[in-house]
Amino acid sequence: MAVGKNKRLSKGKKGLKKRTQDPFSRKDEYSVKAPSTFAIRDVGKTLVNRTTGLKNANDSLKGRIFEVSLADLQNDEDHAFRKVKLRVDEVQGKNCLTNFHGLDFTSDKLRSLVRKWQTLIEANVTVKTTDDYLLRLFAIAFTKRRPNQIKKTTYARSSQIRAIRKKITEIIQREASTRTLAQLTKLIPEVIGREIEKATHGIYPLQNVHIRKVKLLKSPKFDLGALLALHGESSTDDKGQKVEREFKEQVLESV
């Protein structure tokens, strides 16, 4: 008999599989809350690994970005083509408190707006709100037929396009620089577009005027009080109950 390892004996029994642990058993569920500027605040749920050792679940949640349809947040199907980005800034209990992080159009809506025989006019403006948020707003507009127009094309001259773009820039700058981020999020969906349409009617009639995208370039230093106010909560919630300073008295007694 040859001296050595018997390979057949060392093999395990056939059919036995390694026991695998369900990855979801190590996770916790947190609720995502939208700011009080929106009609519906419950965005949904998010999963995160439980706090183990030095890995804190709250640190994993902070900074997460969620993309939600504005129709769901405002309970209005007319806003279904707008997508809002919300960023988690603070975690309280099992709730993730979010703040506005940006806005965008769905690709199908943008494609449906572009048509033949009209001029597309675009403009982008970088503005700073009163609460020190630096934003870049992208506007889109299309020319339309004048009343009683027979010609099928509605092409604007380059001088008219420049004049319209200047008006768009002025209106966005005026509206955004005099408001907070929360006030601006209410105006973006419809109000600014309608105002641009009225102001530029004398230059060339416009249709489908929208703020198609909002990009957050820079945020101010994080302020918990401001975030809680945005969510309609007081900053004094449970703070006094959690902090205990009993160890100080023991030190004084020993001295």
UniProtKB/Swiss-Prot annotation:
Pfam families: Ribosomal_S3Ae. The modification N-acetylalanine is found at A2. It comes from Blastomyces gilchristii (strain SLH14081) (Blastomyces dermatitidis). Component of the small ribosomal subunit. Mature ribosomes consist of a small (40S) and a large (60S) subunit. The 40S subunit contains about 33 different proteins and 1 molecule of RNA (18S). The 60S subunit contains about 49 different proteins and 3 molecules of RNA (25S, 5.8S and 5S). One of its GO terms (cellular component) is cytosolic small ribosomal subunit. Transmembrane segments: none annotated. Residues 19-28 have a biased composition (Basic and acidic residues). Residues 1-28 are annotated as: Disordered. This is Small ribosomal subunit protein eS1. Residues 1-18 have a biased composition (Basic residues). Belongs to the eukaryotic ribosomal protein eS1 family. InterPro entries: Ribosomal_eS1, Ribosomal_eS1_CS, Ribosomal_eS1_euk. One of its GO terms (biological process) is translation. PANTHER family: 40S RIBOSOMAL PROTEIN S3A. Keywords: Acetylation, Cytoplasm, Ribonucleoprotein, Ribosomal protein. It comes from the Eukaryota. It is found in: Cytoplasm.
